[in-house]
Structures are given as C-alpha cells and as structure tokens.
C-alpha cells in the first residue's frame, strides 16, 4: 500500500469567533430623511496564519458600504475568525482549504453579524447573497499564474 493512502485528511473546527466589528453611520440622522436607493458595495478579504503544527487561524474580512449618491449611509466591517485543525494536505489543496473552504464556513457568521449591525443602525434589512469562495479562489490562482507568466516573459 502506498504512503499516500495511509495519510488521511483531517479537518476540525476548533472555534469560530468575531475578531473585530465596526459600524459607522457618518451622515445620520440626515440620511434617514432621504429616499432609500443605496448603492451597496461589498469587499471581501481573507488571511490565514499557522498557529501551531496543523492548526490555522483564518480571518474573513467583510466590508459593506452603502452610499446615497456621494454620501455614505453606513460602513460596516466584520472580521470573522476561525481556528481550524487541518492535517494530511499541503500545497494547492491546503491553499484552497484556507482560502476557500474555511471562508465558506465563516461567511454565514459574518453575514449574520452584518445584518444585525445594519438593523441596529435602523437601516432597512440588508440580505447579503452567498459568496462562491471556490470561484474567487480559482480566479486568484488564474491571476497569479498570469502574473507569473508576465514576470517570466520580462526576464
């Protein structure tokens, strides 16, 4: 039997937590008097850190900005963290796990937190659509491959 078959991939969620929260409504209360037709912008970012052998922290940063014309109605940022035990994978598989699989787990928690903050700011309910982190990760890999090819051509 080969060594590859004897090593199983293990994955466990140790903890999911809110690392940082920020909510700003810089133009309140005047913004409440305006017709509510906001332009909503969503920004996502992930970061991962190895804490110990086989233990990783993944942080998903979600920033939502709602603007009415040139005025910011609200700005909400949540950093949702998770500690995961991951063994038996490496390389691109590990990068996919940390950059797509773990953020997929964290996003519903961040989304709920943002929805709650926006509601507490007395703005209309904000329902963020699910995010396909697998597609975002594949785009990232393609972008990195393209940049690597450009650097290779320049040499």
UniProtKB/Swiss-Prot annotation:
Main localization of the protein described in the UniProt heading: cytoplasm
Q: Which UniProt keywords are given for this protein, alphabetically ordered? A: Chaperone, Cytoplasm, Protein transport, Translocation, Transport
MF GO annotations: unfolded protein binding
Which SUPFAM superfamilies does this chain map to?
SecB-like (SSF54611)
Please verify whether the record's keywords include Cytoplasm: yes
Annotated Gene Ontology cellular component terms: cytoplasm
> Could you confirm whether the keyword Ribonucleoprotein appears in this record?
no
**What processes in GO biological process is this protein linked to?**
protein folding; protein tetramerization; protein transport
The UniProt entry, under Pfam families, shows:
SecB (PF02556)
Q: In which compartments does the protein localize?
A: Cytoplasm
Among InterPro entries, the record links this protein to:
SecB, SecB-like_sf
Describe the subunit structure.
Homotetramer, a dimer of dimers. One homotetramer interacts with 1 SecA dimer.
Q: What is this protein called?
A: Protein-export protein SecB
- Upper classification of the organism: Bacteria, Pseudomonadati, Pseudomonadota, Gammaproteobacteria, Enterobacterales
């Amino acid at each position: 039997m080969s060594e590859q078959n004897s090593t199983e991939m293990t994955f466990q969620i140790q903890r999911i937590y809110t690392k940082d929260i920020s909510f700003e409504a810089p133009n309140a209360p005047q913004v409440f008097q305006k017709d509510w037709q906001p332009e909503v912008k969503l920004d996502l970012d992930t970061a991962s850190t190895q804490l110990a052998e086989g233990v990783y922290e993944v942080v998903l940063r979600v920033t939502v900005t709602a603007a009415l014309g040139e005025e910011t109605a609200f700005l909400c940022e949540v950093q949702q963290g998770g500690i995961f035990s991951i063994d038996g994978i490496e390389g691109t598989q590990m990068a996919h796990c940390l950059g797509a699989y773990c953020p997929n787990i964290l996003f519903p928690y961040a989304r709920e937190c943002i929805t709650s903050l926006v509601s507490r700011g007395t703005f209309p309910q904000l329902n963020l659509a699910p995010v396909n982190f697998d597609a975002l990760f594949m785009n990232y890999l393609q972008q990195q491959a393209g940049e690597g090819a450009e650097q290779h051509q320049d040499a």
